[in-house]
C-alpha cells in the first residue's frame, strides 16, 4: 500500500492512498459473497447467482459499496500509522476508485493534532503549601462526629425558642390555592437553621405547642422553582411537639460508640492522621495544578475547535452524570440556573480551551521526554481498579477491551507520569 501525505491549511492533512490489486480483488470477492445472498435472478437459485451474471445484470458497481466498507476503514488506519499523524476528528473520504485487477485509490482529509511549541517546563521553582493540622481542625471534626451521634428527645417545653426542634404539620397556599411541595406532616424543623423560606422560622418563635398559626412569607425572586419566585404565600402551621437535641459527651465512651477506638485520644490521633493525609492530597493537587498551568502558559499552540468541542462534550456528560445522582435531569438543572446547553457551553468554553491546551502540552512534554507506559503499569492499574471494586483483574481487563477503553486507561497513566515528572523537576525542595 502506498501513502502520500500533503499538509493543507490549518491543522488538516490529506492522505492519498493506493491499495494493491490483490487486496482489491479479495475485497470484491467478499463483497460478492455478501451481496449475492439476497439476489434472485430467473434460472438461478437465490444466493447462487454467478458473479459475472450478477455484474452483467446490475453493473459492476453493485459490489463497490460493500468493497469500500471492506477496504477503506483498515486501509485508512494503516495510512494514518504510515504517515505518523494523530487525527482528532473523523476523516472526509473522497475520490474512491475501484476496479478489478487494478489498484484502488482514495483520498482522506483529516484534522490532526497541532504542533506544540514548548516553553520552559523545568526548574520553575514552585512551592508546595505547608501542611499543618491544628487542634481547631481536630475539634471541628469531633464536633461534627458529635452532631452525627446526637439525638432528638421529646420535652415538656410549651413555647418555641430559637434553636429548638419543632415537629410541625403545614399547608401552604398562594392566592388561596395549594401548591406542589407546599405541605408536609410530622416535619422536623430546627428553628433558626435557615432551612425554610426567609421569615418562616422566625414567626414560629414564641408560639405554643398545640397552637395553629399562620405564617406569611414571600418567596425570594431567585427561588429555584420559577413558578413560585417572588410570590406571597400563607402557611397554616400546626405545632405538634418541641424536641431538644441531646449531644453526647466527648469522652472514652463516646469514642467507643462512634468509632473503632477505645479512647478519645486514640480517636483524636486517627482524626489527625486522616486530616493530614487529606491536606497533603490537597496540597499536592494544588501544586500539580499550578505547575500544569505554568507550563501550559509558557507553551504556544493553536488549539483546534474540534478539541475544544470534545472537551465541552466531556464536561457536559460529567455534569449530567453528577446531576443524575440527585435524581435530576441536566436540562432541568440548567433551567433552574437560567441556562440551556448552548449558553452553558458558551460559559464554559474558556475552561474547555484551557483543558484542551493543557492536554496537548502534557502530551508534547511526555513525547519529548520519552515517557512511555509499560504493559506492567497497565496491569498494575487494572489490579488497583479491580481491588477497589472487589472484582477480578481479568474481568476488568476484558471489559475495558470490549468497550475499547484500554487506550483511554493507558493515556490516563501516561498523563499521570508526565505530571509526576513535572512535579519532580519544578517543585522547590
Swiss-Prot record:
Reaction catalysed by this enzyme: [protein]-peptidylproline (omega=180) = [protein]-peptidylproline (omega=0)
Record flagged with keyword Nucleotide-binding: no
Places the protein is found: Cytoplasm
GO biological process, one term: 'de novo' cotranslational protein folding
One GO CC annotation: cytoplasm
Domain PPIase FKBP-type per the UniProt entry, residue ranges: 163-248
EC number(s) reported in the record: 5.2.1.8
One MF annotation (Gene Ontology) recorded for this entry: protein folding chaperone
Pfam family, one: Trigger_N
This protein's UniProt keywords: Cell cycle, Cell division, Chaperone, Cytoplasm, Isomerase, Rotamase
Superkingdom of this protein's organism: Bacteria
UniProt free text on domains: Consists of 3 domains; the N-terminus binds the ribosome, the middle domain has PPIase activity, while the C-terminus has intrinsic chaperone activity on its own.
UniProt function note: Involved in protein export. Acts as a chaperone by maintaining the newly synthesized protein in an open conformation. Functions as a peptidyl-prolyl cis-trans isomerase.
Family, similarity comment: Belongs to the FKBP-type PPIase family. Tig subfamily.
HAMAP family: Trigger_factor_Tig
Protein name listed in UniProt: Trigger factor
Gene name of the encoded protein: tig
Amino acid at each position: 500500500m502506498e501513502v502520500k501525505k500533503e499538509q493543507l491549511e490549518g491543522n488538516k492533512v490529506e492522505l492519498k492512498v493506493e491499495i494493491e490489486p490483490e487486496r482489491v480483488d479479495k475485497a470484491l470477492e467478499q463483497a460478492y459473497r455478501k451481496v449475492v445472498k439476497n439476489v434472485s435472478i430467473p434460472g438461478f437459485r437465490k444466493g447462487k447467482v454467478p458473479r459475472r451474471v450478477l455484474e452483467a445484470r446490475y453493473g459492476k458497481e453493485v459490489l463497490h459499496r460493500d468493497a469500500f466498507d471492506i477496504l477503506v476503514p483498515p486501509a485508512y488506519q494503516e495510512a494514518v500509522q504510515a504517515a505518523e499523524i494523530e487525527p482528532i476528528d473523523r476523516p472526509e473520504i473522497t475520490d474512491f476508485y475501484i476496479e478489478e485487477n487494478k489498484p484502488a485509490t482514495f483520498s482522506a482529509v483529516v484534522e490532526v493534532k497541532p504542533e506544540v511549541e514548548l516553553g520552559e517546563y523545568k526548574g520553575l521553582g514552585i512551592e508546595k503549601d505547608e501542611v499543618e493540622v491544628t487542634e481547631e481542625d481536630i475539634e471541628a471534626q469531633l464536633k461534627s462526629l458529635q452532631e452525627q451521634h446526637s439525638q432528638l428527645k421529646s420535652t415538656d417545653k410549651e413555647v418555641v425558642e430559637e434553636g429548638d426542634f419543632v415537629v410541625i404539620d403545614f399547608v401552604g397556599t398562594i392566592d388561596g390555592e395549594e401548591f406542589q411541595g407546599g405541605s408536609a406532616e410530622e416535619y422536623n424543623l430546627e428553628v433558626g437553621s435557615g432551612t425554610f423560606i426567609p421569615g418562616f422560622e422566625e414567626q414560629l418563635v414564641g408560639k405554643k405547642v398545640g397552637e395553629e398559626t399562620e405564617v406569611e412569607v414571600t418567596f425570594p425572586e431567585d427561588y429555584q422553582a420559577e413558578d413560585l419566585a417572588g410570590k406571597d404565600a400563607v402557611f397554616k402551621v400546626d405545632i405538634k411537639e418541641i424536641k431538644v437535641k441531646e449531644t453526647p459527651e466527648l469522652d472514652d465512651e463516646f469514642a467507643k460508640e462512634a468509632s473503632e477506638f477505645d479512647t478519645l485520644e486514640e480517636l483524636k490521633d486517627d482524626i489527625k492522621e486522616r486530616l493530614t493525609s487529606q491536606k497533603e492530597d490537597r496540597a499536592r493537587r494544588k501544586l500539580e495544578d499550578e505547575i500544569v498551568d505554568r507550563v501550559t502558559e509558557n507553551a504556544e499552540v493553536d488549539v483546534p475547535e474540534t478539541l475544544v468541542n470534545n472537551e465541552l462534550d466531556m464536561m457536559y456528560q460529567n455534569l449530567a452524570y453528577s446531576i443524575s445522582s440527585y435524581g435530576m435531569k441536566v436540562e432541568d438543572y440548567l433551567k433552574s440556573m437560567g441556562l440551556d446547553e448552548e449558553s452553558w457551553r458558551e460559559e464554559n468554553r474558556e475552561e474547555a480551551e484551557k483543558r484542551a491546551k493543557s492536554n496537548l502540552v502534557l502530551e508534547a512534554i511526555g513525547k519529548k521526554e520519552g515517557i512511555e507506559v509499560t504493559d506492567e503499569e497497565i496491569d498494575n492499574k487494572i489490579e488497583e481498579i479491580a481491588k477497589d471494586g472487589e472484582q477480578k483483574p481479568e474481568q476488568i481487563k476484558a471489559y475495558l477491551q470490549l468497550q475499547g477503553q484500554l487506550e483511554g486507561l493507558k493515556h490516563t497513566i501516561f498523563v499521570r507520569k508526565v505530571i509526576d515528572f513535572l512535579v519532580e523537576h519544578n517543585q522547590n525542595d
